[in-house]
A protein has these predicted regions:
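Active-site neighborhoods and metal-handling regions in enzymes and metal-associated proteins
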Residues: 1-335
Length: 335
């Protein structure tokens, strides 16, 4: 249990499993370790959360995971206390800022000091293997490591594969995230009425997610009426009218940091859907049921693609970007 919500997840078991998944990928690729900046990857490796959205665009946190040896979290300057009690962490250090945002004109000087600390870890705990998987790193930082003999390799591929297969604890976490998301969807459904704006309706999902221990919502995909097509227009102050289709995609990061990615469409007001609305909804349902029936263990991506729902030509130009995608701490591979 964290300070934020109660959960049935066995956190210690989940942490052990996720860390071993990373190390299995490191061994398979003959890497000496990984250096992770992506907040979702840090969460997967350590379970420690700290201002994750801010950290998406500020490299203020990172974790070093050797194939064998101590896991060391580098956290934001005054936030080392946040990792207390996380049993898989051998050590928490203050992160060494190495971006222009934090260091200004002295950026190069601080960058070299950061690289020396990382290279020292590789020498101490890499067992002679200087291949380091890094998920997100600017070119100057990459070059600084390479000058010190570190061989920078692809950490994104490694982490996507590490995150592909969930254990029973993660399944519980995903179900809890879905339950929270469904509660938010119900809150939106109850609140929906003609005359409110898209933003006002969307706020009910955010409020419910936070109240139930959720974390954030990745996109703003709720539109109504003519704004539903083409898709990917963002939520706005448009006033919803009676009879409008209201469409949304939750992209919600819920309790335990797990994603619930649910799409729904409704008709606003006490209005019977038009024949065209019913036709479109029927095609969407046929698509879902057809593709879901294909999913089974051992199915290849190619077989799934070849047998997937034959989309009518009228929808091809504005079809979605993928048939299905993985999900976990975010949208994940395969996509």
């Amino acid at each position: 249990m964290t300070a934020y919500h109660t959960s049935k997840v066995d956190r210690k078991s989940m942490r052990r499993y996720r860390l071993e998944r990373i190390r299995r990928q490191l061994r398979q690729r003959d890497y000496g370790g990984a250096l992770l900046f992506d907040p979702a990857n840090i969460r997967h490796a350590t379970d420690v959360a700290n201002m994750q959205v801010w950290a998406l665009h500020n490299k203020c946190r990172y974790v070093y995971v050797p194939t064998e040896g101590p896991v060391i979290l580098f956290d934001y300057g005054c936030a080392k206390h946040l990792s207390e009690g996380y049993e898989l962490l051998e050590q928490t250090r203050t992160a060494f800022p190495h971006t222009y945002f934090t260091n200004g004109p002295r950026h190069g000087e601080y960058l070299e000091n950061w690289a020396k600390e990382v290279a020292d870890l590789v020498r101490q705990h890499g067992g002679g293997n200087k291949r380091l998987a890094v998920d997100k790193l600017d070119p100057p930082a990459t070059h600084a490591l390479e000058r010190l003999g570190v061989v920078v390799t692809d950490g994104d591929e490694l982490m996507e594969w590490a995150r592909t297969i969930k254990n029973a604890d993660e399944v519980v976490a995903i179900r809890e995230a879905i339950a929270g998301c469904e509660a938010g969807i119900e809150a939106m459904w109850r609140a929906l009425k003609p005359g409110m704006t898209e933003n006002e309706l969307w706020a009910h999902l955010h409020a419910t997610n936070i109240a139930r221990g959720g974390e954030w919502i990745e996109c703003r995909l709720l539109t109504s009426g003519e704004r539903t097509n083409p898709w990917f227009q963002e939520c706005s102050d448009r006033v919803i009218q009676a009879g409008d289709i209201v469409a949304f995609d939750t992209d919600l990061i819920g309790p335990n940091g797990y994603c619930a990615d649910i799409s729904r469409t409704w008709v606003a007001g006490d209005v019977k859907p038009t024949g065209e609305q019913q036709r479109l909804y029927g095609v969407a349902l046929d698509n879902l049921h057809h593709n879901l029936a294909l999913v089974k263990a051992g199915l290849s991506f190619r077989e799934f693609t070849e047998k997937s729902f034959p989309l009518p030509e009228e929808f091809v130009a504005r079809r979605y970007s993928c048939l299905m995608h993985g999900v976990g701490l975010a949208d994940e591979y395969p996509f």
